[in-house]
């Protein structure tokens, strides 16, 4: 049965999703980090998960626990992103001497859940 539930986990508000035999636990206050993704039928955890984790542990080691949204921040030299079929010119938001376009901040921003 599919379901959505607002709950507290590790001292923070979370959204628990159940669908198709899978459970996901998402922390909106941590940039919608998918803290847990589990195949309930097989008992398989897709990400490292510890039920006793705290909010502080998750913030200090976001790269270890779960799957942060649009993780990792990075930079493009001179604001230029080249792909196989195009060249994109992004605004330079890290000025001289570096002249980069820096991206990746959503994983550090709280998100709002709307029903």
Model-found features: residue ranges?
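Surface-exposed acidic/polar loop and edge beta-strand patches at domain peripheries
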Residues: 1-115
């Amino acid at each position: 049965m599919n379901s959505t539930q607002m709950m507290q986990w590790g001292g923070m508000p979370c959204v628990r999703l159940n669908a198709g035999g899978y459970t996901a636990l998402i922390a909106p206050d941590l940039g919608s980090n998918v803290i847990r993704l589990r195949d309930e039928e097989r008992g398989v955890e897709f990400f490292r998960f510890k039920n006793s984790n705290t909010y502080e542990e998750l913030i200090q080691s976001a790269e270890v626990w779960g799957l942060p949204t649009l993780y990792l921040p990075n930079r493009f030299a001179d604001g230029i992103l080249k792909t196989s079929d195009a060249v994109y010119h992004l605004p330079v938001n890290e000025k001289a001497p570096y002249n980069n376009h820096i991206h990746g901040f959503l994983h550090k921003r709280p998100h709002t859940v709307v029903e």
